[in-house]
């Protein structure tokens, strides 16, 4: 008995002249069986303990169900009609009877019944009867308990159909004794004809789509008290469910807020780390700290330089204070604001690469942000110095490869040049002002001096040699030629300063 029970519960069985209450279990021997196995226990305890049933009965050739037959003092009964017998089950309530009826009908398949009246003139006794249709079996039954008075198989019928005020069918020679034409008076002739058509064609009109099982009633409920208890239980479950949902909603709100706070804290930590990283990578000058920085760096640089270098530094004009980068004009935030530090560093590198391929006219724009000239000199790297030796002390230079020629803007060609070394300081200041009206912000003095030395060596009409950046700064890619920049300066073997390389 491995199959699950179709239905089980407390019922009343007829034993002689008395009704006895028993625990009844109905199950199928196999999923495809067309019979039912009825197991009878004394009470539910025997069933739960796994004891052997008191009696068992196999119901074969089931042809119909008849509920609500008043029998032997019970109004709520259910008759399971077979070809050879009928089993009467009694219940304490109408709900329990209907629940058993529904579950058994669902387990058997297509089970229908119609109240008809048999017309005279046939082999059947005329009078009221009940037509039962169970799958492909058709029977007529009467009396209480019901007894079968005629039986047919749908496949053995020659013809059938609805007629005015009734239903007619004809049994063929395969029906044996029940062959012939039979007329049943009923108002449900059309419905009977429809069911016959569906069952003959293998269609189940009362079954839903495959895999979907309807909600079957609970057979254990009985009486008004049981119904009230069931309603109270459902209300209690609804209240418990509502309470759980409210607790979940209240407990979920702090969690979500905590997640938001954790996310915001993590983002703030990330922004602080970005600020610290950018402060190590970039050094944007400030208006207030520029003068202090130059005054603090002055003594250290003078002590590290030689006597000649000190003299050259004394003759060099002082640097103009660096102006702060006005990032607000281009829609950016200040570098001290959180969240823009890493972006400022990336914008610096991006603007530096954007100037590649442009000519030297960009040096005129003193307000350009991110250009190479606007970057401050490195604090740790010393500023390159020029050679202080007299011009006649130059030694023999080793010839190198051909000199690269570059196009020079007219602004540099038309700049006034003063070859006399006595007026070098004044010419330095004049050439710096002629390049853009004023010295570019943050332009190192060595760049200006190197550019003047390069202009003094070139002749009129010849191409100007562009100065090379200092070792602490990057080369500005402003020439059309790719590759490393040419060497325009040589290191002096006497003082170690830079001097312009003469043409070969």
Curated annotation (Swiss-Prot):
Residues 285-297, 331-341, 421-430 have a biased composition (Polar residues). Residues 105-210 form the IRS-type PTB domain. The gene is Dok7. Keywords: Cell membrane, Lipid-binding, Membrane, Synapse. Changing residue 174 to A: Abolishes interaction with MUSK and function. It holds the Pfam family IRS. SMART domains: IRS (SM01244), PH (SM00233). The PH domain mediated binding to phospholipids with phosphoinositol headgroups. Affinity is highest for phosphatidyl 3,4,5-trisphosphate, followed by phosphatidylinositol 3,4-bisphosphate and phosphatidylinositol 4,5-bisphosphate. Residues 263-280 have a biased composition (Low complexity). It comes from Mus musculus. It is found in: Cell membrane; Synapse. Residues 210-232, 248-348, 371-483 are annotated as: Disordered. SUPFAM superfamilies: PH domain-like. Probable muscle-intrinsic activator of MUSK that plays an essential role in neuromuscular synaptogenesis. Acts in aneural activation of MUSK and subsequent acetylcholine receptor (AchR) clustering in myotubes. Induces autophosphorylation of MUSK. Homodimer. Forms a heterotetramer composed of 2 DOK7 and 2 MUSK molecules which facilitates MUSK trans-autophosphorylation on tyrosine residue and activation. Interacts (via IRS-type PTB domain) with MUSK (via cytoplasmic part); requires MUSK phosphorylation. GO terms for cellular component: mitochondrion; neuromuscular junction; nucleoplasm; postsynaptic membrane. Transmembrane segments: none annotated. PROSITE patterns: IRS_PTB, PH_DOMAIN. This is Protein Dok-7.
């Amino acid at each position: 008995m491995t199959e699950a029970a179709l239905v089980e519960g407390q019922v009343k069985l007829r034993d002689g002249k008395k009704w006895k209450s028993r625990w009844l279990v109905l199950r199928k021997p196999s999923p495809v069986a067309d019979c039912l196995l009825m197991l009878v226990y004394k009470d539910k305890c025997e069933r739960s303990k796994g004891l052997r049933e008191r009696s068992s009965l196999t119901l074969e050739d089931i042809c119909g169900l008849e509920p609500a037959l008043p029998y032997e003092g019970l109004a709520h009964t259910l008759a399971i009609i077979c070809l050879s017998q009928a089993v009467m089950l009694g219940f304490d309530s109408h709900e329990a009877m209907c629940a058993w009826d529904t579950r058994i009908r669902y387990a058997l398949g297509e089970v229908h019944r119609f109240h008809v009246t048999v017309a005279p003139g046939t082999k059947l006794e005329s009078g009221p009867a009940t037509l039962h249709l169970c799958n492909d079996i058709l029977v007529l039954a009467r009396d209480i308990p019901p007894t079968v008075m005629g039986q047919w198989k749908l496949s053995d019928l020659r013809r059938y159909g609805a007629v005015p005020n009734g239903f007619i069918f004809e049994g063929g020679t395969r029906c044996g004794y029940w062959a012939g034409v039979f007329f049943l008076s009923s108002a449900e002739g059309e419905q009977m004809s429809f069911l016959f058509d569906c069952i003959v064609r293998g269609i189940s009109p009362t079954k839903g789509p495959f895999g979907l099982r309807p909600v079957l009633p609970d057979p254990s409920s009985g009486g008004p008290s049981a119904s009230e208890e069931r309603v109270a239980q459902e209300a209690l479950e609804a209240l418990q469910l509502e309470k759980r949902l409210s607790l979940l909603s209240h407990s979920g709100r702090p969690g979500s807020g905590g997640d938001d706070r954790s996310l915001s804290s993590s983002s703030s930590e990330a922004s602080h780390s970005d600020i610290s990283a950018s402060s190590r990578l970039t050094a944007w000058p400030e208006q207030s700290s520029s003068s202090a920085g130059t005054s603090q760096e002055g003594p250290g640089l003078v002590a590290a330089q030689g006597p000649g270098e000190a003299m050259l530094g004394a003759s060099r004009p002082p640097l103009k204070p660096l102006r702060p980068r006005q990032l607000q004009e281009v829609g950016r935030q200040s570098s001290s604001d959180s969240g823009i530090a890493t972006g400022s560093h990336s914008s610096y590198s991006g603007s530096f690469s954007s100037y590649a391929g442009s000519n030297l006219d960009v040096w005129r724009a003193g307000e350009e942000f991110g250009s190479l000239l606007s970057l401050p000199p490195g604090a740790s790297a010393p500023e390159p110095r020029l050679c202080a030796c007299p011009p006649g002390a130059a030694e023999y230079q080793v010839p190198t490869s051909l000199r690269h020629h570059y196009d020079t803007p007219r602004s540099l060609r038309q700049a006034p040049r003063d070859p006399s070394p006595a007026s070098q300081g004044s010419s330095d200041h004049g050439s710096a002002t002629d390049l853009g009206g004023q010295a570019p912000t943050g332009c190192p003095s060595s760049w200006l001096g190197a550019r003047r030395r390069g202009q003094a060596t070139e002749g009129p009409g010849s191409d100007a040699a562009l100065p090379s950046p200092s070792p602490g700064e990057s080369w500005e890619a402003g020439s059309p030629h790719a590759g490393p920049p040419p060497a325009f300066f040589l290191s002096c073997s006497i003082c170690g300063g830079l001097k312009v390389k003469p043409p070969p």
